[in-house]
Regions:
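Conserved alpha/beta catalytic core and glycan-binding cleft of carbohydrate-active enzymes
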Residues: 50-52, 70-252, 258, 290-314
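Short acidic-aromatic active-site loops that bind/stabilize oxyanions
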Residues: 27-31, 211, 271-275
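Tryptophan-centered motif/residue detector
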Residues: 22, 45, 175, 264-267
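Residue-level signal for pocket-adjacent positions within structured domains
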Residues: 6, 22-24, 129, 179, ...
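Alpha-helical packing segments of well-folded alpha/beta enzyme cores
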Residues: 34, 38-45, 91, 95, ...
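Catalytic cores of secreted or luminal carbohydrate-active enzymes
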Residues: 260-294
Length: 314
């Protein structure tokens, strides 16, 4: 940060150079030295370490001068009201150009909370050139549903709308949950479904309706998410088979402990536990997608019965 003794060689001067929530520095993407440094990094990791692509995390913070903090993007005018950092947008387009020139097979994915149009549109069409954007609304919707409604109250029409509410011209990565739900302080979907029963009733001979219900809903949530994904699907390690604990990397707040910096893969290998059934379902689900080419089609409803809560889509 103070390579030449100053605070703003590569960053904005003053308060603009500091992110108020993250405590990190903010690059001035209008400086040629910053562009050279960042673009050379994109090239370096592809060539030297054979990376197969990049996921650009939290680009909402880059796109807007206020970082999109405490802001709801409810209309298109909010994307183009002078609050956008055009230099950052230019850098993202240049980064995609460089990455795809160095390795045409490389994949780039953008995580943007605001939903800015054009993030995953071709540069030639005025977009930023990302191959995919994260479908951020889907995991939030599942968590909201699990928190606020019993499963018998779920409305299939609303569910289908939320899972397919994305721009057709931009490819998206859908997912039911990710690292955000698996880190300390949050709960995975399976833990929300079965709670403490996960520690005592996951044996193959245990009879527990909470576990039975939780496993069935866990499978259904993943199947309907991948079935409506259309472009791509994301999973986070261990979540596919209901790992019971969170991940917490060593930090000052936990006394630099490694106790939860792990995944207990022995659980899914234990034939006396039911975790393996969730894992078998996930493998079969992924194989089905590979065999049928689901991601080549957009889901369309064929039959919708709101009274009986029935939905058939293809």
């Amino acid at each position: 940060s103070r390579f030449d003794g100053s605070y703003d060689q590569y960053f904005f001067p003053g308060n603009r150079g500091f992110h108020s929530l993250w405590g990190s520095r903010c690059f001035d993407y209008g400086k040629h030295e910053v562009l050279n440094f960042l673009l050379s990094n994109c090239k370096y990791w592809l060539e030297e370490f054979r990376f197969d692509g990049y996921r650009f995390d939290g680009i909402t913070s880059m796109l807007y001068w206020d970082h999109g903090i405490n802001k709801d993007f409810t209309e298109y005018s909010l994307y183009y009201d002078g609050n956008q950092d055009e230099s950052a947008i230019t850098y993202l387009a240049l980064a995609n150009r460089v990455i795809h020139q160095v390795d045409p097979e490389a994949i780039t994915i953008a995580e943007d909370m605001s939903g800015m149009p054009g993030v995953a549109s071709p540069i030639e069409d005025g977009g930023m050139g990302f191959d995919y954007r994260m479908n951020m609304g889907t995991p939030d919707y599942w968590i909201k549903l699990l928190k606020e409604k019993r499963d018998e109250e779920w409305h299939v029409g609303d569910l289908f709308y939320e899972l397919t509410n994305k721009r057709e011209e931009e490819h998206t990565i859908s997912y039911a949950e990710s690292h955000d739900q698996a880190l300390v302080g949050d709960k995975t979907i399976f833990f929300r479904l079965v709670d403490k029963a996960i520690y005592s009733s996951m044996g193959v001979f245990d009879k527990n309706v909470i576990i039975d219900r939780g496993m069935s809903l866990h499978k259904m949530i993943r199947l309907v998410t991948i079935g409506t994904a259309a472009d791509g699907y994301l999973n986070f390690m261990g979540n596919e088979w209901g790992h019971p604990e969170w991940i917490d990397f060593p930090r000052e707040g936990n006394g630099w402990s490694y106790d939860h910096a792990r995944r207990l893969w022995s659980l899914v290998d234990d034939e006396n536990l039911r975790f393996r059934f969730l894992n078998m379902f996930d493998k079969a689900m992924i194989q089905m997608v590979n065999d049928t080419g689901v991601f080549h089609w957009r889901p369309e409803p064929l039959v919708r019965d709101n009274e009986r809560q029935g939905l058939i889509f293809t």
